[in-house]
Amino acid sequence: MTRTLRLAALAPVMAGLAACTTLPSDRLPPAPAPAPVITLPPTTTVPSPVPAPLPTPAPVPAPVPVPAPPPPPALPPLPPAPPPPPAPPPVSAAEVRAVALRVLPPNISERSGWADDIATAFAALSIPAQTHKVCALAAVIEQESTWQADPPVANLSKIAKAELDKKRERFGIPKAVMDLALSKTSPDGRSYQQRLDRLRTERELSMLYEDMIREIPLGAQLAGGQNPVRTGGSTQVSVAFATEQMRDKPYPWRPAGTPREEVFKRRGGLYFGATMLLDYPVSYNRMLYRFADYNAGRYSSRNAAVQSLLTQLTGQKIDPDGDLLRYKAGEPVSPRTEPSQAWRALLALQAELGVNAAQIERDLKLEKRFEFETSPTYRRLYQLADKRGLKPPREQLPDIDLNSPKISRKLTTAWFAERCEMRYRVCLARDTVSPPVPAASDPRP
C-alpha cells in the first residue's frame, strides 16, 4: 500500500522527465514563410559630364647629336731612320802623339809620358787623331786632377775619419773597440791609425780599406765587405766602369793589374776617361754636352732636352735631370711599376704621337744608347714639336746638383761642363797647325 502511494506521488515527476527526454522525430520542421518582396522605386541615372578633349601636345624635337671631337690629325709617316754611324777607321798612335805634344800644357810633369799614354789609348779605342778630341780629354784631366795620376784630396784624412765614425755608430761599435782595431799593425808596417792620420789621396784610402777588409773583422764589417772608394785617378772614373771596360774590351797594356789598380795609374786613368768621354756616338754640336754627359751619365744632355720638350708639349713639370726612367741600384725600373715623369707625359701625348704604351716603354729602355734617337717615340716627339711650330734644341745641360763628401760648396753638372769647356778652348788655342774651332760648334764632337 505504501509502495503504491509512493508511485502515485512520483507520477507527475516522471511525466515531466519524459517530456524532457523525448527522442528526435523524423518529421521536418515547417518551412519558414517567404520574406516579403520590396519593390524599390526606379532610380534616375545622372549622366557624367563628358570631359573636354585634351590639347594635342606639340611634338618634341629629337635631340641634336653632339658630334664627337675629331681625333687629332695623324702625323705624316716617319722618314727612314738615319743609318748608324760608320765604324771608325784605324788610328795611328804616332799621329795622336804628335797632336798631343802640340796641345798639352807645356809645364806639366812627365809631359811626354802623358802624350804616349794618350796615343796608346786613342789607338786602342779608334778615336781619331784630332785636336778637339785630344783637347777634350786634356780638359777633363786638368779639371779632375790637374795632370796628376793620383791627385791629393783636401782634408781627406778628416773626411775618412768622419765616415768611419758614422759607420761605427750605425753598427753600435764602442769607440774603445774601434781604437783598439786601428792600433793594430797593418801590412805596410804602420798601424791603421797612422795610415788614417796621413791620408792624402784616394789611392791611399783605397789601399787602407783593402787591408782592413782582409786583415781585421771590424774592417770588413764597417766596409760591408766592399771597398767604399768607388772613383779615382786622373779622370775620376768609377772602378765599376773600369771593371766593365776591362771585361768587354782588350786592355792595351800588359801585364795589367786589377781594374781598381789600373784606375789609379796614369795610363789607366786616362784610358778609362777617354772611353767614358769619347768612345760613344753623339749628335751634339758642341763638346760642352759631352762634358755634361761625363759628369751626369751618357746621353744625359740629349735626354734633358727631351724632358724640357715634354714640359712644353704637355705643361707637366718635369725635372731635366737626364733620366727618362727611374733607377734602383743603377738599374732601370719598368715605368709600369714606378712611372717616371717622362713616361706620364708621353702617355698623355699617345693620341697625337700615334705610338702605343708598349712601344713607348721599349723606346725608353734605349735612353742610355744612341739608338734612342732612331726610335719611333723620339722621332715622333720632335715631329709633333715641328707641327706645333716649336724649334726645340736636341741637347741641353742637365740640371743636377753634385753631392760628395769631397765637395764643400754647391756645384752642378752645368758648372762642371762649363769649366771643362773653358779649359778645352784654352787647349785648342795652343794648336797652331789645325784651323781654329768656332765656339758655337765643334766638328763632330
What residues fall within each predicted segment?
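Secretory-pathway extracellular proteins and peptide precursors enriched for disulfide-bonded cysteines
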Residues: 11-12, 412
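Bacterial N-terminal signal peptides that target proteins for export
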Residues: 1-9
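Bacterial Sec-type N-terminal signal peptides, specifically the leucine/valine-rich hydrophobic h-region
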Residues: 14-17
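Cell-wall glycan-active module
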Residues: 3-4, 20-445
